[in-house]
Amino acid sequence: MNDPRIELRIPRWLHHKVEAHLAHLLRPDGSADEDFLEPRGEPALLGPDSVSWKIFKNPLGLYIGGIAAVVLQLAEPRVGSGVWQYTTFRQRPLERLQRTGHAALMTVYGPRSRAEQMIAAVTRLHERVRGIASDGRAFCASDPELLEWVHATACFGFLEAYHAYVQPLAALERDRFYSESRPAAVLYGARSTPESQAALEALFARMCGQLQRSDIVFDFLRIMRRVPALPVPLQPLQVLLTKAAIEVIPAALRDGIGLGTARSLAPWQRRLVCHAGDAADRLVLSTNPAVQACRRLHLPDDFLYAPRPNDSAMPRTNQ
């Protein structure tokens, strides 16, 4: 693979098209770039040297990781029932994905005041989401136990997608990523969240028997294969990205929810996804919230794309 630390240069016309598509994907309602550009100088919940800023800059990794996270979330009966009963995911999946993606990026890159305001609005909404799950248990979206699972699976998905398809991460980076996420998790209402890779694995071990095979999961995967998230010429790749997401889920959890290995990537497909992930990690786009956050803090556009001491510490072995 190419050195991921070297900025990718593509023809200007193509660069503009990619920027425009990313802007539409992240801001479907036409909201302004000032979400991340202003107020000038205001810090985010996390600093630009964080592992989170490194990982969240990659839109392909976020897409793959987001699918993996939602699969695990929907397999928990209370979370799955809440999402399917109280959101517009089935009717307007792309709009739902766009809002969720924007919220995740605001949490990481947005100015602290706006991020906290957005999170407060989300928590108020969660208070109103109550019902009976498919397994007969009552649920509320503000339940700290459910928020912990949603937060942990989101962190897991984004981290593992980046590690598998973009750039391998050292153990210290993985632990840092989980510990960095703690302040935002508390704001969302999660009282106890994994702060290390070991803690995440322990949570997964406890949850393994509580996840269920669900038609909701399979409906979600069918939607993700069809939703027009990519430009029309690239939409056939969504099947591969969905497979890539399933593949990062631990085998024990995957088997327990009925996904098995039938949806695994072929070796050539894995190489293709890795090449795409590498390219996305080296393409500096002015519409990327990561770049806009750097501008807000008076940092160069390519700050997150410059070499770091540990970038080449772990060679990839699956390509």
Label every model-predicted segment.
Residues 1-149, 153-319:
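Mature, function-bearing regions of proteins
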